[in-house]
Amino acid sequence: MEIIEGKMPFMGYETYYRIVGERSEKPPLVLLHGGPGSSHNYFEVLDELAQKDGRRIIMYDQLGCGESSIPDDHPELYTKETWVKELEALREHLALRKMHLLGQSWGGMLAIIYMCDYHPEGIQSLILSSTLSSASLWSKELHRMIKYLPIEEQAAIHRAELTGNFNDPDYLKANEHFMNQHAIDMTKTWPECVMRKKRGGTVAYETAWGPNEYTPEGNLHDYEYTDKLSKIKVPTLITSGTDDLCTPYVAKTMQDQIASSKWRLFEGCGHMSFVEKTDEYVALLQEWLDQHDE
């Protein structure tokens, strides 16, 4: 199976991209990773989709992480506007006139911003994987789930939020426990691409989002797109897990606002159902993409 890696010039920096699969008449699937700052690595579990479906899959590292440039000395670049420009530049660079778009976590937010504010042409369908349409609802739901942690861990998180000290060992332990429960359990063994250490991303994450998943105090703190979701007119597949940071309430809120949407809930999965149930997820994607190529 052909894999092409390259770098695109962008704003005086470079954006790394990775194209999997043979050239095809089918519109490619473009993947937007989470974070901000998480890198494309974990998306490599979806490489098999390119072979099974005969369609190219394109993933890339957004500015600030992975194999792309990491201008941490210019954190003012880490905004939704920069990352939308980067997506548009990649479409132009790779001549992506028609494509499907999948965004996971922050990548889904980026996809929502792109669809609602920029009204792009040529998007055959949208896949919103474990994402959100409202920073305030996300924070509220995650704080609700924090109440299921042991009392001492709840207290450590509350104390860190009050003091702003997110380096306290008790907080770090509590947050790790929470993320292992609802993101992905890193005490387990996963494919190499999921376990692989990524480059950079911390400054991008803290600048744009915040110190953790449930304290959005970066420049995306006012991300509120629920009332804009009706602007999305393309077929939309929403996916999430029963144990996800993207709670069923968060996922249902999005489905209720997007007219041509369907929602698939993965039993027993956290924030990366495509990693935890790869075969099932790939089969779902293949069926969905084939239905919406035209």
Curated annotation (Swiss-Prot):
Active site: 105, 244, 271
Enzyme class: hydrolase
Keyword set, alphabetical order: Aminopeptidase, Hydrolase, Protease
Domain AB hydrolase-1: 27-277
Temperature dependence: Optimum activity at 40 degrees Celsius.
pH effect on activity, per entry: Optimum pH is 7.5. At pH values above 7.5, the activity sharply decreases.
Reaction catalyzed: Release of N-terminal proline from a peptide
GO process terms (BP): proteolysis
Subcellular location: Cell envelope
GO cellular component: cell envelope; membrane
EC number: 3.4.11.5
GO molecular function, one term: aminopeptidase activity
Pfam families attached to this UniProt entry: Abhydrolase_1
Family as reported in the entry's similarity comment: Belongs to the peptidase S33 family.
Function recorded in the entry: Releases the N-terminal proline from various substrates. Hydrolyzes only di- and tripeptides with proline in the first position.
Quaternary structure and partners: Homodimer.
Official protein name in the record: Proline iminopeptidase
The organism of origin for this protein: Lactobacillus helveticus (Lactobacillus suntoryeus)
